[in-house]
């Protein structure tokens, strides 16, 4: 029957672009956002896959470091404070997210060296005359 087109075969199940790429982040949704956002007139097929992979990697990195910060503080739940500590203590993430403010993140503990008590030079039992 000519002119019918390809059509979907009855037995085939739809496979998402995320699962094809081995990603958890939604490639289709990111593609839709890229098109809707008018970032460019046309969006290549690989662009949303690449962007989803980058976002997934950065998210996994931040969550791993924040989980370590939560464990260091003997907590089971990651809160914004742990995310703040994770980002600010990591050199590369700190540079990437330097201008970002995290709500309820607090500040890094830091005491200026001038304000710290001076260490005495003499050892035990020695007194200056």
Curated annotation (Swiss-Prot):
PANTHER family: HISTONE H2A (PTHR23430). Its main location: nucleus. InterPro entries: Histone-fold (IPR009072), Histone_H2A (IPR002119), Histone_H2A/H2B/H3 (IPR007125), Histone_H2A_C (IPR032454), Histone_H2A_CS (IPR032458). GO terms for molecular function: DNA binding; protein heterodimerization activity; structural constituent of chromatin. One of its GO terms (cellular component) is nucleus. Gene3D superfamilies: Histone, subunit A. It holds the Pfam family Histone_H2A_C. Keywords: Chromosome, DNA-binding, Nucleosome core, Nucleus. The keyword Nucleus applies. It comes from Volvox carteri (Green alga). PROSITE patterns: HISTONE_H2A. SMART domains: H2A. Belongs to the histone H2A family. It is found in: Nucleus; Chromosome. The lineage of its organism: Eukaryota, Viridiplantae, Chlorophyta, core chlorophytes, Chlorophyceae. The keyword S-adenosyl-L-methionine does not apply. Core component of nucleosome. Nucleosomes wrap and compact DNA into chromatin, limiting DNA accessibility to the cellular machineries which require DNA as a template. Histones thereby play a central role in transcription regulation, DNA repair, DNA replication and chromosomal stability. DNA accessibility is regulated via a complex set of post-translational modifications of histones, also called histone code, and nucleosome remodeling. This is Histone H2A-IV. CDD domains: HFD_H2A (cd00074). The nucleosome is a histone octamer containing two molecules each of H2A, H2B, H3 and H4 assembled in one H3-H4 heterotetramer and two H2A-H2B heterodimers. The octamer wraps approximately 147 bp of DNA.
